[in-house]
Every structure is written in structure tokens, then in C-alpha cells.
Amino acid sequence: MIYKLYFDGSCKYKNDGSCDMGMGAVVLDSRNNIVYEQGWNTPAYDHKDDNGILSNNVAEYQALFRGLDALSVKRPDGISELRIYGDSKLVIEQVQGNWKVKAAHLKKYRDSCVAQIKLYEKEGCKVSLEWIPREQNKPADRLAQNAADGMERHSNQLHDERD
């Protein structure tokens, strides 16, 4: 069976240089039914890059990692293919190995996501990643935005579409 994972990250910046970070992940089954969705937040998270500049990239990486992790914990039987979609070109290209990770603080996030993907592949699951425009990522974006505003969402348990 084919499953699709949509992820997104968001930061609501504050005057003190910190931000409220939100992450969202949505998993669809092969019939495009939502089988899992979740929004997570990390309030007042300071995630400056190597140049001391605030970046949204950590939130994007965290969203991908948490989505992969949640799916692996609640993994449905018979998942043969996982298609991953996100609107962060940087995260998609770096995880695929097409772009170098220039910011040292992002390398650990990229490595964690790649390790998760390799676990799926080791079990015979075909994994692909694709960049999509923000307009096609609205459910994950909405979860991330709401989580950054302090409204975490925990939804239905992941289940096999045969249930």
C-alpha cells in the first residue's frame, strides 16, 4: 500500500529573538483518506543559524522528522511505498542529497531524517520525496500554523486502510 506524508514547519517570531515553533504532519492512505494528522509546538524556541539569523528551516526539518517518527511508531501493515511531500525546497533537496548542508546546525536534523528514511527502505519500503508548492500543502501548513499559535492537535491513530 502507498502512503503519503505531508509535512510543514512554521515559526511565529517574537521581539526577543525567539519564536514559537509549530510543526505539522498529515498521512494519507492510498485512497487519500487522512489516517493520521498531528501538530506539535515548541514555545519560545531560539533557533538561530550559524550567522545568528533566525531561520524557519529547523521547524521544517522537525516536522519531517516527527512525521516519519510518528508513522514508524504507528506503522500500518503492508506499507510498500511512502511518498513524502513538503514545501521546503531546502529540506527536500538536502535530504535527497542533491544540495549540500552548508549550515552546520542543520546537519544533525538532515542526518536524523535520512536515518529514519533508511529504516523504511531497509524494511523494503520505497521512499520518495517531492517538493510541492505551499498551496498543495495546506493541511500540514494549517497544523503547523496552529501549533505555532499554541494549539497542538492530536488526531486519529494511524490505522491500516483495511480496518
Model-assigned labels for residue ranges:
Residues 10-16, 65-154:
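RNase H catalytic domain
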Residues 155-163:
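Extended, charge-rich low-complexity interaction segments
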Residues 31, 62, 143, 162-163:
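Intrinsically disordered, low-complexity regions of eukaryotic proteins
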Residues 1-58, 70-73:
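RNase H-like nuclease fold core
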Residues 58, 62-66:
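Short amphipathic alpha-helical face segments that pack within enzyme cores
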Residues 2-4, 144-147, 163:
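Charged, low-complexity, intrinsically disordered terminal regions
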